[in-house]
């Protein structure tokens, strides 16, 4: 009984910190995707860099920008067989995206099946929308050997260009 109370208390106390770390990791991966070097940046600097360069945009599936929807209001649905994440509001599908001002780029969330799990990441396109600026993977359940390589720069650089 005491252990369960302590676990519940710890979970409650750490919830804000966990949410902060999830948001920080998201912002780090979006910034890394456009080539930002974050190695010397603390959390405050990362949030500041993100806020000054990245804006959230919501797109219809035809590519039109939707002005009156916040990305936080979209419900994500994961297709277990393909690993594809889809985003909905009132049963209408949208695509959350991000626009970088420096460097100019468009970033979209990506997901898909690997060998053992679904991989989640971000994919950045240069302004021409044809040239890949970068890719990052922030979540996967692949094995540490080959699967762990998706997080390494040498692997991610294979997609650039």
Task: Give residue ranges: language-model regions.
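Flexible, solvent-exposed loop/hinge segments and secondary-structure transition points
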Residues: 1-161
